[in-house]
């Protein structure tokens, strides 16, 4: 099936869905697989061009993350090349190293398991099941976050102080990177898994989300570099790239708005921030499984 079977309305809808769910801890890939199946859309999910099309949308998401965190990336870039003030260089290089450490596990594991995961990508019931698992993972992170903190707790088990992003160690980054590998399974959220990894290392929601969104950029760009060439050489009808470009813009705008909302949300609701997303994933996943089974 050729990619032209996805009409413009479907492409824009998938783009908006991608832009929001890539950052929200609810699994963008899981939604991209499950929702079309629920709506009865005949999308080319079994085509070699479907995943590259989704990654093309990731390019819009990556642009949104780069624009939103441009100060962070400029500080890192200028520090790494020694262009920043001397007292900023060591910290910039240290954080850059942490980003590299956190990114490597997903690159290695993804490279080893790519073909098996491709089969999982095509199955809406499996993605719906792991959406439920994702909800449980988020609840697990919230439940155990206090036990992982080196700081004292109050009588109601709320942590009185949390670690900031600047305190991350190499082991913190590696642990978060290992958690990111779980998101290679459709239905498991990359941002959710990495935020949980940060919480279990005693980092607060806002700092965990900040680091999660920073390491998202190289992962998304890496996936784009690997997949988009396949799209360029696929059997694609005229006009598809115009539709894909429009969809990428829609995904980018949605991703920027989602990032702005989430950074404020995680800052203002540190004691229970993941719970609403957890309940949503469990209910949505169970509902999708029931619909796919009985419909």
Swiss-Prot record:
An MF annotation (GO) of this entry: undecaprenyl-diphosphatase activity
E.C. code: 3.6.1.27
Keyword Cell inner membrane among record annotations: yes
Coiled coil: none
Entry keyword Transmembrane: yes
Miscellaneous comment as given in the Swiss-Prot or TrEMBL entry: Bacitracin is thought to be involved in the inhibition of peptidoglycan synthesis by sequestering undecaprenyl diphosphate, thereby reducing the pool of lipid carrier available.
Keyword terms, alphabetized: Antibiotic resistance, Cell inner membrane, Cell membrane, Cell shape, Cell wall biogenesis/degradation, Hydrolase, Membrane, Peptidoglycan synthesis, Transmembrane, Transmembrane helix
HAMAP family per UniProt: Undec_diphosphatase (MF_01006)
UniProt subcellular location: Cell inner membrane
Entry function: Catalyzes the dephosphorylation of undecaprenyl diphosphate (UPP). Confers resistance to bacitracin.
Residue ranges crossing the lipid bilayer per the database entry: 12-34, 50-70, 95-115, 120-140, 209-229, 243-263, 272-292
Pfam families: BacA (PF02673)
Reactions catalysed: di-trans,octa-cis-undecaprenyl diphosphate + H2O = di-trans,octa-cis-undecaprenyl phosphate + phosphate + H(+)
Mode of membrane association: Multi-pass membrane protein
Protein's recorded name: Undecaprenyl-diphosphatase
């Amino acid at each position: 099936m050729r990619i032209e079977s996805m009409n413009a309305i479907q492409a824009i809808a998938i783009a908006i869905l991608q832009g929001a769910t890539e950052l929200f801890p609810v699994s963008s890939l899981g939604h991209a697989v499950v929702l079309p199946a629920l709506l009865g859309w005949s999308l080319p999910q079994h085509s070699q061009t479907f995943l590259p099309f989704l990654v093309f949308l990731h390019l819009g998401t990556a642009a949104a993350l780069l624009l939103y965190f441009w100060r962070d990336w400029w500080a890192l870039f200028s520090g790494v090349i020694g262009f920043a003030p001397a007292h900023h260089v060591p910290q910039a290089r240290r954080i850059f190293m942490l980003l590299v450490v956190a990114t490597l596990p997903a690159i290695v594991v993804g490279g080893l398991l790519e073909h098996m995961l491709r089969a999982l990508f095509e199955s809406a019931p499996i993605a719906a099941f792991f959406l439920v698992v994702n909800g449980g993972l988020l609840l697990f992170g919230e439940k155990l976050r206090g036990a992982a903190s080196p700081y004292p707790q109050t009588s109601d088990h709320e942590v009185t102080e949390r670690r900031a992003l600047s305190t991350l160690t190499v082991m913190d980054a590696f642990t978060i990177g290992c958690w990111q590998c779980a998101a290679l399974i459709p239905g498991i959220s990359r941002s959710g898994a990495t935020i949980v990894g940060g919480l279990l290392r005693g980092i607060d929601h806002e700092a965990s989300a900040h680091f999660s969104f920073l390491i998202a950029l190289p992962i998304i760009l890496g996936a784009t570099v690997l997949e988009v060439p396949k799209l360029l050489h696929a059997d694609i009808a005229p006009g598809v790239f115009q539709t894909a470009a429009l969809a990428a813009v829609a995904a980018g705008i949605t991703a920027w708005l989602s990032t702005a909302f989430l950074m404020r949300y995680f800052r203002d609701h540190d004691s229970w921030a993941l719970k609403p997303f957890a309940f949503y994933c469990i209910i949505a996943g169970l509902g999708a499984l029931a619909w796919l089974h009985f419909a």
